[in-house]
C-alpha cells in the first residue's frame, strides 16, 4: 500500500531529460515489439463471430473481424468500386425479381431542368438523421464530392412504423450519375448519364423503373403511429412537372393527371392506381363497371306441363324432391323462404360513377310447391295432367296424441305410443304434468312415429312414381315399335319409287335417242 500511496515527486524532481520520457512513433516502435513482429509490422487476427461459435461451427463463417496494429479497416472510406458493388447488392436484395439492368421497358428520358419533386408535408428531422443509414450517407457524400452538387436537402419523414426514408433532391446543373435509394427499398430511381451531351446542357436522366412495394417493417419506436401518418407513409406521392418529354407517355386528359405504369402490370394494378390518383385529386368516385346479378328459377309445374303437352319428354319430378301435404320429411317449413327457393329472384345492380347511383334489389315471391300427377289413358301417348298447389302442413295422425300445455290430470296415450315406449324401454307415463325425463322420452317416441309415417309415405310415393315410369316406358316402347314399322314401310315405298324413277328415266333417254 505504501507504493500506491506514494507520489512520483521524486521521479519528476530528478534530473531526467523530459524528451527521453516521450515515445517516438517512428523509430522507437520496434523496441516495443517482438522479433516476429518486426518482420511483419501489420498483424491481422481473424476470429469467428460469437453466433458462429455458439452454433458449434455447423454454420459457415459469415464475417471475419480484422484487427490491425497499423490501420483501422472499418474506418476506411469506400472506394467507388466497392460502393457500386454495395448498390448492386442493394438492388438484388430489394428487387430480386426485376433488376434495373434488365428492366428496360417503359424507359422515359426527362430533362432535369423541368423535373421537380414535391413531397407531402411530413414531420422532417434534421439532416443529422441521415447518418442512421450508412449506405445512403456514403453514397450521398460521394455524389457531393464527385459532382459538385450545389444543393442537396435530405428529409426523412418519421412515422410510427419507421418504414420509409425519402430523399428530396433539388436537381440543378450537374452531369454525373446519381443513385438515390430509400432505406426500406420501397422505391428505386436510377439515373444514368448521357455522355454525348455538351457541357452547357444539363444531363438527361433515364428513369429505368419506378417500383413501389409496400412491406411491413419492424417499428422503431414503442409509440403507435397516428392514422394520418400511416396513411401518408403507405403512399409515395411524386408530382412531376414536365415541360418537354422526348418519348410518349400515358396521359389522362380528363383529370389532367399523369400515370406511369410498367408493361408487366396487370389490369388490377392499373385500376388501383387510377383510383388512388382520383383520390389524390379530390374525387371520391370509384371506377366500377356496371354489374348485374340475376338468379331466377321457374316452378316445376311449367316444366311438367310442357312435358305432358308433348307425348314424351322429361319424366316427372321424383317425390323425394316434392314435399308432402301430410308428412314433414327432412325439410323444415322455414327453408321454403330461403334465398334460393324456386321462385326467388335476386337482382344486384351497380350504376356508373357518373350517375352516382347504386341500388340493390332483392325480391322474393311467395314460396309455393306444385305437385303434378298424370295418368296414361291409352297406348297412343295421350295423357292428362292436373296441377295442385299446396303448402306444408304438420302431420296430424290418430297415432299420436296431443295434450295442451300446462294441463293436469290423466295422460291419454295412443296404442302406437305405448307400444313404442315399451319397445324403447321407457316407462309409460300416467299423470300430468310430465317430468323432464318423461317429456324427453315422449318427444323422442313421437318423433320416431312421425319418421315412420313419413318413411311409409315416401315409399308409397316412390312406388307410385316407379309405376308411372314403368307405364310410360311401356307406352314409349310400343310407340317406338310402331315407328320402326312405319319406317320400314316408308323405306320399302321409297325403294319402289326409286326403281320406278330409274325405269322412267331409261325410257325417256331411249325415246330421245330414237328421235335424234
UniProtKB/Swiss-Prot annotation:
PROSITE patterns: BZIP, BZIP_BASIC
One GO CC term, this protein: mitochondrial nucleoid
Leucine-zipper as annotated region, ranges: 469-476
Phosphoserine modifications at: 75, 79, 82
Gene Ontology biological process: chitin-based larval cuticle pattern formation; dorsal/ventral pattern formation; larval chitin-based cuticle development; positive regulation of DNA-templated transcription; positive regulation of transcription by RNA polymerase II; regulation of mitochondrial transcription; regulation of transcription by RNA polymerase II; salivary gland development
Tissue specificity annotation: In all cell types examined, including developing salivary gland in embryos and in adults, brain and optic lobe cell bodies, salivary gland, midgut epithelial cells of the cardia, female ovarian columnar follicle cells and male seminal vesicle, ejaculatory duct, and ejaculatory bulb.
InterPro entries: bZIP, bZIP_sf
Alphabetized GO MF terms: cAMP response element binding; chromatin binding; cis-regulatory region sequence-specific DNA binding; DNA binding; DNA-binding transcription factor activity; DNA-binding transcription factor activity, RNA polymerase II-specific; sequence-specific DNA binding
Alphabetic keyword roster: Activator, DNA-binding, Nucleus, Phosphoprotein, Transcription, Transcription regulation
Region annotation Basic motif: where it falls in the sequence: 443-463
Task of the protein: Transcriptional activator. Binds to fat body-specific enhancers of alcohol dehydrogenase (ADH) and yolk protein genes. BBF-2 may play a role in fat body gene expression. It binds the consensus sequence 5'-T[AC]NACGTAN[TG]C-3'.
Protein name as annotated: Cyclic AMP response element-binding protein A
Organism: Drosophila melanogaster
Lineage: Eukaryota, Metazoa, Ecdysozoa, Arthropoda, Hexapoda
Amino acid at each position: 500500500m505504501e507504493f500506491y500511496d506514494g507520489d512520483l515527486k521524486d521521479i519528476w524532481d530528478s534530473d531526467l531529460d523530459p524528451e527521453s520520457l516521450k515515445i517516438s512513433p517512428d523509430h522507437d516502435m520496434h523496441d516495443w515489439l517482438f522479433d516476429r513482429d518486426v518482420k511483419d509490422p501489420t498483424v491481422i487476427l481473424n476470429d469467428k463471430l460469437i453466433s458462429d461459435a455458439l452454433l458449434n461451427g455447423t454454420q459457415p463463417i459469415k464475417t471475419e473481424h480484422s484487427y490491425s496494429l497499423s490501420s483501422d479497416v472499418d474506418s476506411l472510406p469506400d472506394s467507388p468500386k466497392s460502393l457500386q458493388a454495395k448498390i448492386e447488392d442493394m438492388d438484388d436484395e430489394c428487387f430480386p425479381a426485376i433488376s434495373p439492368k434488365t428492366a428496360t421497358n417503359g424507359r422515359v428520358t426527362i430533362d432535369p431542368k423541368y423535373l421537380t419533386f414535391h413531397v407531402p408535408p411530413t414531420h422532417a428531422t434534421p439532416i443529422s438523421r441521415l447518418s442512421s443509414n450508412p449506405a445512403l450517407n456514403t453514397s450521398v457524400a460521394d455524389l457531393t464530392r464527385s459532382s459538385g452538387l450545389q444543393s442537396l436537402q435530405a428529409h426523412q419523414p418519421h412515422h410510427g412504423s419507421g418504414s420509409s426514408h425519402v430523399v428530396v433532391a433539388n436537381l440543378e446543373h450537374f452531369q454525373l450519375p446519381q443513385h438515390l435509394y430509400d432505406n426500406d427499398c420501397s422505391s428505386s430511381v436510377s439515373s444514368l448519364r448521357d455522355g454525348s451531351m455538351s457541357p452547357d446542357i444539363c444531363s438527361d436522366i433515364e428513369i429505368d423503373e419506378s417500383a413501389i412495394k409496400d412491406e411491413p417493417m419492424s417499428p422503431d419506436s414503442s409509440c403507435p403511429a397516428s392514422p394520418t401518418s400511416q396513411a401518408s407513409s403507405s403512399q409515395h406521392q411524386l408530382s412531376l412537372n414536365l415541360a418537354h418529354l422526348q418519348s410518349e407517355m400515358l396521359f389522362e386528359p380528363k383529370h389532367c393527371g399523369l400515370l406511369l405504369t410498367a408493361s408487366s402490370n396487370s389490369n388490377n394494378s392499373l385500376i388501383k392506381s387510377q383510383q388512388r390518383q382520383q383520390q389524390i385529386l379530390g374525387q371520391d368516385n370509384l371506377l366500377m363497371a356496371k354489374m348485374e346479378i340475376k338468379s331466377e328459377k321457374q316452378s316445376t309445374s311449367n316444366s311438367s306441363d310442357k312435358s305432358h303437352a308433348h307425348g314424351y319428354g322429361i319424366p316427372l319430378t321424383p317425390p323425394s324432391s316434392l314435399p308432402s301435404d301430410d308428412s314433414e320429411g327432412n325439410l323444415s317449413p322455414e327453408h321454403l323462404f330461403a334465398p334460393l327457393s324456386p321462385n326467388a329472384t335476386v337482382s344486384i345492380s351497380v350504376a356508373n360513377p357518373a350517375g352516382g347511383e347504386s341500388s340493390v334489389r332483392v325480391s322474393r315471391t311467395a314460396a309455393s310447391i306444385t305437385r303434378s300427377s298424370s295418368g296414361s289413358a291409352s297406348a297412343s301417348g295421350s295423357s292428362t295432367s292436373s296441377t295442385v298447389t299446396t303448402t306444408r302442413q304438420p302431420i296430424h295422425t290418430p297415432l299420436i296424441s296431443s295434450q295442451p300445455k300446462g294441463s293436469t290430470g290423466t295422460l291419454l296415450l295412443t296404442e302406437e305410443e305405448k307400444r313404442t315406449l315399451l319397445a324403447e324401454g321407457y316407462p309409460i307415463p300416467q299423470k300430468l304434468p310430465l317430468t323432464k325425463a318423461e317429456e324427453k322420452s315422449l318427444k323422442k317416441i313421437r318423433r320416431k312415429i312421425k319418421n315412420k309415417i313419413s318413411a311409409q309415405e315416401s315409399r308409397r310415393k316412390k312406388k307410385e312414381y316407379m309405376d308411372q315410369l314403368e307405364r310410360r316406358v311401356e307406352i314409349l316402347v310400343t310407340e317406338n315399335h310402331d315407328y320402326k314399322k312405319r319406317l320400314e314401310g316408308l323405306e320399302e315405298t321409297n325403294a319402289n319409287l326409286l326403281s320406278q324413277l330409274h325405269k322412267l328415266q331409261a325410257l325417256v333417254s331411249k325415246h330421245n335417242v330414237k328421235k335424234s
